[in-house]
């Protein structure tokens, strides 16, 4: 299977962005914050497919985990995280501190969910001993 130049660039950007330290705390062990770049975020809105909606309806009747919804939510979280990393990279950050997720239902009865991943983009440097 061959890839296009855009696919290769996109893949490289994702690998580069994922190597960025991200923490839910406001410090990175062994590093000091040199510069605050600002709040970065990634937002994704997803809605279930018709098939997922039918399966979800059946699970509501008999109970249990709705695997298709769980997978949809996990993919939405990952995409929001990736978008946040890309946003941080674009503004010159090399780390994100104070990362959080938030999710809410949007669109009333459509079952659509918004996932927000956010944090503070920073430039860090190793602590000199």
Residue ranges and their predicted role:
Residues 1-52, 94, 111-129:
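N-terminal presequence-like segments and the immediate start of the first folded domain
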Residues 25-28, 102-106:
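Short, solvent-exposed loop/turn elements at beta->coil junctions and helix N-caps
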Residues 40, 45, 53-100:
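Short, well-ordered alpha-helical segments
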Residues 101-102, 126:
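Short, ordered loop/turn segments at secondary-structure junctions
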């Amino acid at each position: 299977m061959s890839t296009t130049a855009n696919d290769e660039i996109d893949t490289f950007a994702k690998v580069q962005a994922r190597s960025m330290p991200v923490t839910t705390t406001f410090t990175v062990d062994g590093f000091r914050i040199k510069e605050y770049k600002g709040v970065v975020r990634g937002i994704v809105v997803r809605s279930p497919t018709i098939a997922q909606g039918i399966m979800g309806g059946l699970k509501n009747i008999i109970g249990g985990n709705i695997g298709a919804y769980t997978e949809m939510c996990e993919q939405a979280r990952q995409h929001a995280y990736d978008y946040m990393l890309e946003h941080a990279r674009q503004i010159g950050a090399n780390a994100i501190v104070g990362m959080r997720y938030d999710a809410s239902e949007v669109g009333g009865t459509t079952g659509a969910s918004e996932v927000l991943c956010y944090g503070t983009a920073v430039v860090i440097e190793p602590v000199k001993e």
